[in-house]
């Protein structure tokens, strides 16, 4: 994997590095691009939405690494609402939507499925984060079919695959990835780094990809070109500074 798209800084409230430290780690690993995706404001300790609007001040390159501006938003309710205003979307390149227990207390399979389908169809999110969490069971096939229809990526999260966070996710991640492959879904991969030394740690994801023989043309984090092409498919405007990376 060449792109790291799920990273956090101390601004998330429970992470421990700056964006510059994350970029430096990416640079030392030879990663050409990464996205900063701090938690949105409903998460305890997370920043006000102005933090995300103001990402426009960030340079497009830090330590020689291309910087994508993003956010990991919270799925807030059955209607699929997220916790950043619509006006913020235009300042972001990448929005991941995830269930988090402090924001959306787990309900049941039907409720979780309905919320995911609503958020996919809203058109506001580019990917669904760490879906393997057993606390948020859902109809895998129904949700992934909807994601295929709307070109929303399914995240395969390295931290979930370690088995120590969101315990019980490992087998579910494999099943989700298997169905994603069968249905032709795009997947995104990430280490879910909350500390700079975890940038670029994809070993568990790579094992899953190898085990399932997942097609690389459906892994949007395989290269900058593929990731930027996916953003274009999603309707994002081209990023002029990344023109050379898109070829």
UniProtKB/Swiss-Prot annotation:
Cited HAMAP family: YcdX_phosphat
Keywords (A to Z) from UniProt: Hydrolase, Metal-binding, Zinc
Entry's Gene Ontology BP terms: bacterial-type flagellum-dependent swarming motility
Alphabetized GO MF terms: phosphatase activity; zinc ion binding
Taxonomy of the source species: Bacteria, Pseudomonadati, Pseudomonadota, Gammaproteobacteria, Vibrionales
Protein name (Swiss-Prot/TrEMBL): Probable phosphatase VSAL_II0887
Family matches, as InterPro entries: Phosphatase_YcdX_put, PHP_phosphatase, Pol/histidinol_Pase-like
Cofactor needs: Zn(2+)
GO cellular component, one term: cytosol
Family: Belongs to the PHP family.
Binding residues annotated for Zn(2+) 1, in chain numbering: 14, 39, 194
Residues that, per the record, bind Zn(2+) 2: 72, 100, 130
Enzyme Commission numbers on file: 3.1.3.-
Top-level class of the enzyme under EC nomenclature: hydrolase
Recorded superkingdom: Bacteria
NCBIfam families: PRK09248.1
């Amino acid at each position: 994997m060449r792109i790291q798209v799920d990273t956090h800084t101390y601004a998330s409230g429970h992470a421990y590095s700056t964006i510059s430290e994350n970029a430096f780690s990416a640079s030392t690993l030879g990663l050409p691009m990464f996205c900063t995706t701090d938690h949105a404001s409903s998460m305890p300790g997370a920043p006000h939405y102005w933090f995300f609007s103001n990402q426009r001040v960030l340079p497009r390159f830090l330590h020689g690494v291309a910087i994508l501006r993003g956010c990991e938003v919270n799925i807030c309710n059955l209607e699929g609402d997220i916790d950043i205003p619509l006006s913020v979307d235009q300042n972001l390149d990448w929005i991941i939507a995830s269930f988090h227990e402090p924001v959306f207390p787990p309900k049941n399979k039907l409720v979780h499925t309905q919320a995911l389908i609503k958020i996919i169809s809203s058109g506001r999110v580019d990917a669904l984060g760490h879906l393997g969490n057993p606390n948020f069971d859902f109809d895998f096939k129904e949700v992934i079919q909807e994601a295929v229809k709307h070109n929303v990526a399914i995240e395969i999260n390295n931290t979930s695959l370690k088995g120590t966070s969101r315990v019980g996710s490992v087998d579910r991640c494999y099943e989700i990835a298997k169905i994603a492959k069968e249905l032709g879904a795009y997947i995104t991969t990430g280490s879910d780094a909350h500390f700079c030394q975890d940038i670029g740690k994809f070993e568990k994801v790579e094992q899953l990809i190898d085990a399932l023989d997942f097609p690389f043309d459906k892994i949007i984090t395989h290269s900058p070109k593929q990731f930027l092409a996916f953003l274009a498919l999603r309707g994002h405007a081209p990023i002029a500074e990344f023109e050379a990376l898109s070829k």
